[in-house]
């Protein structure tokens, strides 16, 4: 687990709404706009409220998202596909969006409710992020907090920092994966990937 992930687990980040408003006003002035004109006068408030929602993952705990288990003993793969995700690229503060496919072999003490996997994706997506780390964090949390014996996470996303600026390739999608534990076995991994790719 890298230093960033550890720090997020240790600390509860606070949200400074007034600080965000002031930063937006300064940003608008810095790009040559008038933050007091009619169309922009309420923009700092709107962005401050939006960012509170977009970055709720900074205050959320992956352990809380995964806390409840059901007493079902299975060593078979559980897979939830096409979990919608929206995040913000930490390099340009532009959105990226797509889907996560999350599969795991449960711990011996039970399975999680299926909604827990979607909640876990939200915990890590709702923060300044890069897709590669997002994918790894989801996988690592399932091992660390749910005791999963095997994990596979695949994310497929479109990045607006590639679509709107720079190379401007709007149809490009980025795919990242993370595999842990029993799912590193080639046969088990192949089975999981076939289920993920089966549309």
UniProtKB/Swiss-Prot annotation:
GO terms for biological process: one-carbon metabolic process; tetrahydrobiopterin biosynthetic process; tetrahydrofolate biosynthetic process. Its EC number is 3.5.4.16. The keyword Lipid metabolism does not apply. Zn(2+) binds at residues 89, 92, 161. It is an enzyme of class 3 (hydrolase). Keywords: GTP-binding, Hydrolase, Metal-binding, Nucleotide-binding, One-carbon metabolism, Zinc. InterPro entries: GTP-CH-I_C/QueF (IPR043133), GTP-CH-I_N (IPR043134), GTP_CycHdrlase_I (IPR001474), GTP_CycHdrlase_I_CS (IPR018234), GTP_CycHdrlase_I_dom (IPR020602). It catalyses: GTP + H2O = 7,8-dihydroneopterin 3'-triphosphate + formate + H(+). It holds the Pfam family GTP_cyclohydroI. Pathway: Cofactor biosynthesis; 7,8-dihydroneopterin triphosphate biosynthesis; 7,8-dihydroneopterin triphosphate from GTP: step 1/1. One of its GO terms (cellular component) is cytoplasm. PROSITE patterns: GTP_CYCLOHYDROL_1_1, GTP_CYCLOHYDROL_1_2. SUPFAM superfamilies: Tetrahydrobiopterin biosynthesis enzymes-like. GO terms for molecular function: GTP binding; GTP cyclohydrolase I activity; zinc ion binding. Signal peptide: none annotated. Belongs to the GTP cyclohydrolase I family. Toroid-shaped homodecamer, composed of two pentamers of five dimers. PANTHER family: GTP CYCLOHYDROLASE 1, GTP CYCLOHYDROLASE I. This is GTP cyclohydrolase 1. It comes from Bifidobacterium longum (strain NCC 2705). The lineage of its organism: Bacteria, Bacillati, Actinomycetota, Actinomycetes, Bifidobacteriales.
């Amino acid at each position: 687990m890298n230093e960033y992930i550890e720090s997020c687990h240790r600390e509860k980040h606070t949200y400074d709404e007034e600080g965000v408003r002031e930063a937006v006003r300064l940003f608008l002035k810095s790009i040559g706009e008038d933050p007091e004109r009619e169309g922009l006068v309420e923009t700092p408030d709107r962005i401050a409220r939006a960012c509170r929602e977009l970055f709720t993952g900074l205050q959320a705990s992956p352990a809380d998202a995964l806390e409840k288990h059901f007493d079902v003993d299975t060593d078979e793969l559980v897979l939830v596909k096409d979990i919608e995700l929206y995040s913000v690229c930490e390099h340009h503060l532009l959105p990226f969006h797509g889907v996560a496919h999350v599969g795991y072999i449960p711990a011996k003490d039970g399975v999680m409710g299926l909604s827990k996997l979607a909640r876990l994706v939200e915990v890590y997506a709702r923060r300044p992020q890069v897709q590669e780390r997002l994918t790894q964090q989801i996988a690592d949390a399932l091992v660390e907090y749910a005791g999963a014996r095997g994990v596979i996470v695949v994310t497929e996303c479109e990045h607006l920092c590639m679509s709107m600026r720079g190379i401007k390739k709007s149809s490009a999608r980025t795919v990242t994966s993370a595999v842990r534990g029993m799912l590193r076995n080639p046969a088990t991994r192949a089975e999981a990937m076939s289920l993920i790719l089966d549309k």
